[in-house]
Swiss-Prot record:
One of its GO terms (molecular function) is acetyl-CoA C-acyltransferase activity. It comes from Escherichia coli O6:H1 (strain CFT073 / ATCC 700928 / UPEC). SUPFAM superfamilies: Thiolase-like (SSF53901). The keyword Lipid metabolism applies. PROSITE patterns: THIOLASE_1 (PS00098), THIOLASE_2 (PS00737), THIOLASE_3 (PS00099). It catalyses: an acyl-CoA + acetyl-CoA = a 3-oxoacyl-CoA + CoA. This is 3-ketoacyl-CoA thiolase. Its EC number is 2.3.1.16.
Amino acid sequence: MGQVLPLVTRQGDRIAIVSGLRTPFARQATAFHGIPAVDLGKMVVGELLARSEIPAEVIEQLVFGQVVQMPEAPNIAREIVLGTGMNVHTDAYSVSRACATSFQAVANVAESLMAGTIRAGIAGGADSSSVLPIGVSKKLARVLVDVNKARTMSQRLKLFSRLRLRDLMPVPPAVAEYSTGLRMGDTAEQMAKTYGITREQQDALAHRSHQRAAQAWSDGKLKEEVMTAFIPPYKQPLAEDNNIRGNSSLADYAKLRPAFDRKHGTVTAANSTPLTDGAAAVILMTESRAKELGLVPLGYLRSYAFTAIDVWQDMLLGPAWSTPLALERAGLTMSDLTLIDMHEAFAAQTLANIQLLGSERFARDVLGRAHATGEVDDSKFNVLGGSIAYGHPFAATGARMITQTLHELRRRGGGFGLVTACAAGGLGAAIVVEAE
């Protein structure tokens, strides 16, 4: 076991998570169509503060993330402060770590708490895949800049004459890695082939995710942590996630064609997480501040870890890399965990990471560790379903997972939970939480 790194303040206070909330998650271009991420962020933070009944001045910092950036609101965190009735003096800044963005937001607020610069803060994220920053071609962008500097009409017309019809076509946000040109689904296909993961295994995991998420909603387990969203023009509220397919069968999954490698692939729309709109946030405090306010924490941060690997091959292995480091810093092993919640970007990616967590060879030859991190106990794994079912508003997923895990730990009488995710750019994140 390596060095244990306790997450405590200089006074010995633990970092408490006192509350968490999210919007329902909606598939692209459905219930939240036309609502930008900044408005989803305001929606969830405003409701979180109202439910917690914490005075606005108690919150000293808000760290929020957004992956699909909107140029007109580059600092989503500050816009949320200004748009929710929070104290205007609240420090606010934005972060981005792809699919692990709200993991980073939580870590940043925790570090402010440990440094003693604040005693309470909010962390979270929001994304909209329905309101996208549609851009212009590089050539058109350059011409427009030059036109703005031109002094005469003839100069402007000459500049415009350089353009061709193709230069005028709108450019949607990139869906591929900037450095490699590979789409996330291409990487998932790589991983399926590298680790021998079959189409049947992927479909089975996706089906499991939907069934468990549907059961969680049916049992009322998510009601406390998901707000009802009232959507302009306020005629139709959204109270539940709208991607979950509780009535599907494995035969339904088998009907879909591969989405990326059309000839030989196994990754489909059904065994991948869909483009999604939504927001999620958590309130963090020092343990003593929570006691002063008479608040009973949902749980506490035990450790966190971030890792990075190469992007050319099998880059979505973040959980296999970050989990052993987070467990080491927490002073725990896999067997100590009550729950394991892994982000399901793709079924292939999820199954590959599960495989490598239990691999002695991977631990020894790749991580340089003496033993495997540990086998993943299916009875502890994604017990309420995962991102394939709920959806994945990129910056919101981490906060959803943390809140969901802490609520489930409390229902089970406490224990330790691991929350982990892969992210674009070969990044990985893992957070260990505990509940009493």
